Amino acid sequence: MSPESGHETISGTSDFVVVANRLPVDLERLPDGTTRWKRSPGGLVTALEPLLRKRRGSWIGWAGVADSDEEPIVQDGLQLHPVRLSADDVAKYYEGFSNATLWPLYHDLIVKPEYHREWWDRYVEVNRRFAEATARAAAEGATVWIQDYQLQLVPKMLRMLRPDVTIGFFLHIPFPPVELFMQMPWRTEIVEGLLGADLVGFHLPGGAQNFLVLSRRLVGANTSRASIGVRSRFGEVQVGFRTVKVGAFPISIDSAELDGKARNRAIRQRARQIRAELGNPRKIMLGVDRLDYTKGIDVRLRALSELLEEKRIKRDDTVLVQLATPSRERVESYIAMREDIERQVGHINGEYGEVGHPIVHYLHRPIPRDELIAFFVAADVMLVTPLRDGMNLVAKEYVACRSDLGGALVLSEFTGAAAELRQAYLVNPHDLEGVKDKIEAAVNQNPEEGKRRMRALRRQVLAHDVDRWARSFLDALAATGETGDSGVTGESTPAPESDSGSF
């Protein structure tokens, strides 16, 4: 992207700018050599696109194709500023540091993180590129909202380039316990990068508390010591003459839109058709996940296999549909994980299936949105069993689609959603017997009990939607310039060791 051409078209005029690793559309190269834009998948796009349209903002991000030089464009009413990434950038910044270093570290070391200096150097370089693109696009005094773990250095870089703008940062994945984060060789640089923001947001209070501890320990900052609440009771970090707010803002979905779509006659007809295509089983279990080692797909497969072996679930009237969206297909750990999951699927079907009646129906491809909603409506039991997940919007999407008060949600305790969806069948994914018990209970739940649970879940999801999430974050960001009692102690001593155990 040419900075000059970008500036001459739509750069420098945006009062509200979203900065994310990806644009809300993908650049697709066609066989004839031409290109076209198509909507890209992902919870972040779902969450922020409606907000951008309402506020007529700009989006800074990568177009999804390496070595592509694209000019800023207006697509479906959105101003988009593509950031160029080379194939080497993708390998080192994205597949390397972002997804083989940060991702496993922030997800409790389910897979061992890799630390390579050349990956870190490229992460710094690409973050600077994003910061410079944002500085060109933002109008004087603009509000900038930076998204997620790939861009944790951008707040400080942008602060140095454009001290006039108001900067928010939100982390969409879990923020790790202090003792895990301390393993990172570049831990101080990342904390300092985040402290360039006026407001740093996490899904849960525990992640925010962890960040306060690290701010004291790694940069010697004065911080507030009181507990942080959800969308309230913010923490504060004193950085020179600036005060950085730290808060918890659980992300959500456009629940009203999903609720309306799930009531659509064509969707409900398709749900009935899905049941018929599956042989009209008594119970349909459903898993919908990006193919990732954090999602616990193997956990539910092992649980199902043992339940079938123990005859606690009948193989002739129960099926599992597992929809697995392809992800990071060039990363070794993901290649091995896919092979293992598909081996487990084959084992279950070989042991317990019949000709024309597999137990597990496994699809490894993206599913169109309306088709996914029909699966949500058709499914009797939704299995959401991650080993660690910042929030998990699939759980909320399933609930939003169940206006009939049918269905049951089996939900890992180690998702951010579990803090809100307390009426789900909560499970510890590391306790296989416990997972089996809750799946069995969900499959056999009393209809009245099921309605009571689903009614409570829907009350939560419909009231706390994505608009409320975005509004609460942006209201808090707008208030960062206000003065008042900071609650910051006069001490800059390191946190006591007990603080490092905060979740």
Swiss-Prot record:
Temperature optimum or stability note: About 60% of the activity is lost in the absence of FII after 10 minutes at 40 degrees Celsius, but only 35% in the presence of FII.
Annotated gene: otsA
Top-level class of the enzyme under EC nomenclature: transferase
Binding site residues for UDP-alpha-D-glucose: G42, G43, R290, K295, L393, V394, A395, K396, E397
Region (Disordered): 481-503
Keywords from the named record: Glycosyltransferase, Transferase
Cellular component GO terms held in the UniProt record: cytosol
Activity vs pH: Optimum pH is 7.
Gene3D superfamilies: Glycogen Phosphorylase B
Statement: the UniProt record of this protein carries the keyword Zinc: no
Annotated site residues (Involved in alpha anomer selectivity) in this chain: W103, I173
Name of the protein in question: Trehalose-6-phosphate synthase
Phenotypic effect of disruption: Cells lacking this gene do not accumulate ADP-glucose, however combined inactivation of both glgM and ostA accumulates ADP-glucose.
GO annotation, biological process: trehalose biosynthetic process
Family stated for the protein in its record: Belongs to the glycosyltransferase 20 family.
Function as written in the Swiss-Prot or TrEMBL entry: Involved in the production of glycogen and alpha-glucan via the TreS-Pep2 branch involved in the biosynthesis of maltose-1-phosphate (M1P), and probably in the osmoprotection via the biosynthesis of trehalose. Catalyzes the transfer of glucose from UDP-glucose (UDP-Glc) to glucose-6-phosphate (Glc-6-P) to form trehalose-6-phosphate. ADP-Glc, CDP-Glc, GDP-Glc and TDP-Glc are also glucosyl donors, however, when the pyrimidine sugar nucleotides (CDP-Glc, TDP-Glc and UDP-Glc) are used as substrates, there is an absolute requirement for a high molecular weight polyanion for activity.
Catalyses which reaction(s): ADP-alpha-D-glucose + D-glucose 6-phosphate = alpha,alpha-trehalose 6-phosphate + ADP + H(+); CDP-alpha-D-glucose + D-glucose 6-phosphate = alpha,alpha-trehalose 6-phosphate + CDP + H(+); GDP-alpha-D-glucose + D-glucose 6-phosphate = alpha,alpha-trehalose 6-phosphate + GDP + H(+); TDP-alpha-D-glucose + D-glucose 6-phosphate = 5-methyl-UDP + alpha,alpha-trehalose 6-phosphate + H(+)
Oligomeric and partner information: Homotetramer.
GO MF annotation list: alpha,alpha-trehalose-phosphate synthase (GDP-forming) activity; alpha,alpha-trehalose-phosphate synthase (UDP-forming) activity; trehalose-phosphatase activity
Pathway(s) served: Glycan biosynthesis; trehalose biosynthesis
Regulation: Stimulated by the polynucleotide FII (physiological activator), and by chondroitin sulfate (CS) and heparin. Activation by the polyanion is inhibited by high salt concentration as well as by high concentrations of mononucleoside phosphates.
Record-listed D-glucose 6-phosphate binding positions: R22, Y94, D148, R328
EC number: 2.4.1.15, 2.4.1.347
InterPro entries, per the entry: Glyco_trans_20
